[in-house]
């Protein structure tokens, strides 16, 4: 069983990417689980017709189990598989970690609890999974959100980014976390996924960033009107229009990720290097503004 984690700046299209990769793998006959590691608990909604599912932490609170240890909960069979795992598109297993009540506790606790619970309930083996995809909150590489890479649970980490300055800045911070944790047995970087967000996106900017990081760009997802169209319907592009070119892009990306067994230790850029890339982006924006 493979375990892969996806990180990236909030709003970069990470959940869209994860859901489409999951859908592509499920269509290939793989048994797939997607674990949403974001307190907003909407990571898997496009696999379930736009419907959100109860989170693991919400279920524990509703059953009055949030103060008990996981060993006690499992030993006394106080929680069942159907309480926390829901089926989505083409049999994909969907799990949402959730977070604490607003203003209370650590938002990363849900990630720690859900991964621990899934392992102790032996669900990965019982469900005979081929691959687990962790969709992890934005650019926070601390506490529970770092668990998939910190503990080496994921075989590789993939970072979703555009050529936007803040997306690159966040991607660099994530790679800094990867390079630090890998010294203690953490996960390596599988590569960057270039998610084109608009007409000003530039491949050469991402290529320069990847070269300096020592990272591969494993795929480029073009900007497409079909993506938001599909999401309004609560679907992936794979489900919404399986014959479109963008669906094939996701299939090829899914195949690359599933077959990749290699990882690298990134060399995060210093702030001065990130600022240099930022200035190049700024010059492009100014030139574009002058045209108009």
From Swiss-Prot:
- What reaction gets catalysed by this protein? N2 + 8 reduced [2Fe-2S]-[ferredoxin] + 16 ATP + 16 H2O = H2 + 8 oxidized [2Fe-2S]-[ferredoxin] + 2 NH4(+) + 16 ADP + 16 phosphate + 6 H(+)
Residues at which [4Fe-4S] cluster binds = 106, 142
List the lineage, top down: Archaea, Methanobacteriati, Methanobacteriota, Methanomada group, Methanococci
Name a biological process GO annotation: nitrogen fixation
Which family does this protein fall into?
Answer: Belongs to the NifH/BchL/ChlL family.
Sequence positions that bind ATP: 8-15
Q: Does the keyword Transmembrane apply?
A: no
List keywords of the entry alphabetically.
4Fe-4S, ADP-ribosylation, ATP-binding, Iron, Iron-sulfur, Metal-binding, Nitrogen fixation, Nucleotide-binding, Oxidoreductase
Instruction: Kindly report, in one word, the top-level EC class recorded for this enzyme.
Output: oxidoreductase
Q: How is it modified after translation?
A: The reversible ADP-ribosylation of Arg-109 inactivates the nitrogenase reductase and regulates nitrogenase activity.
PANTHER family attached to this UniProt entry? LIGHT-INDEPENDENT PROTOCHLOROPHYLLIDE REDUCTASE IRON-SULFUR ATP-BINDING PROTEIN
**Function description:** The key enzymatic reactions in nitrogen fixation are catalyzed by the nitrogenase complex, which has 2 components: the iron protein and the molybdenum-iron protein.
NCBIfam families the record matches: nifH, PRK13230.1
ADP-ribosylarginine: residues carrying this PTM: 109
Which superkingdom? Archaea
User: Pfam families from the xrefs?
Assistant: Fer4_NifH
The protein here is known as: Nitrogenase iron protein 2
CDD domains in the record, alphabetically?
Answer: NifH
Summarize subunit and interaction data from the UniProt record for this chain: Homodimer.
Any one GO molecular-function label of the UniProt entry: ATP binding
């Amino acid at each position: 069983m493979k375990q892969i984690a996806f990180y990236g700046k909030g709003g970069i299209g990470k959940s869209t990417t994860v859901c489409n990769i999951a859908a592509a793998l499920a269509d290939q006959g793989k048994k797939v689980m997607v674990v949403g590691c974001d307190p907003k608990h909407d990571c898997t909604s496009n696999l379930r017709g736009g419907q959100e599912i109860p989170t693991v932490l919400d279920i524990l609170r509703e059953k009055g189990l949030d103060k008990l240890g996981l060993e006690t909960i499992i030993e006394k069979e106080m929680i069942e598989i159907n309480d926390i795992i829901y089926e989505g598109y083409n049999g994909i297993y969907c799990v949402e970690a959730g977070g604490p009540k607003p203003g209370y506790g650590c938002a990363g606790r849900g990630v720690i609890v859900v991964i621990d619970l899934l392992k102790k309930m032996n669900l990965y083996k019982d469900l005979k999974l081929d691959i687990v995809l962790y969709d992890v909150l934005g650019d926070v590489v601390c506490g529970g959100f770092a668990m998939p890479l910190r503990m080496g649970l994921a075989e590789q980490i993939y970072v979703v980014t555009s050529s936007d300055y803040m997306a690159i800045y966040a991607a660099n911070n994530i790679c800094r976390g990867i390079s630090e944790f890998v010294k203690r047995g953490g996960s390596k970087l599988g590569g960057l996924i270039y998610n084109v967000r608009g007409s000003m996106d530039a491949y050469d900017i991402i290529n320069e960033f990847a070269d300096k990081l020592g990272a591969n760009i494993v795929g480029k997802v073009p900007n497409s009107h079909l993506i938001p169209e599909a999401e309004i319907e609560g679907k992936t592009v794979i489900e919404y229009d399986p014959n479109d070119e963008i669906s094939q892009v996701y299939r090829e990306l899914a195949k690359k990720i599933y077959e990749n067994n290699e990882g690298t230790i990134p060399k995060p850029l210093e702030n001065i290097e990130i600022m240099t890339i930022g200035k190049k982006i700024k010059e492009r924006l100014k030139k574009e503004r002058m045209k108009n």
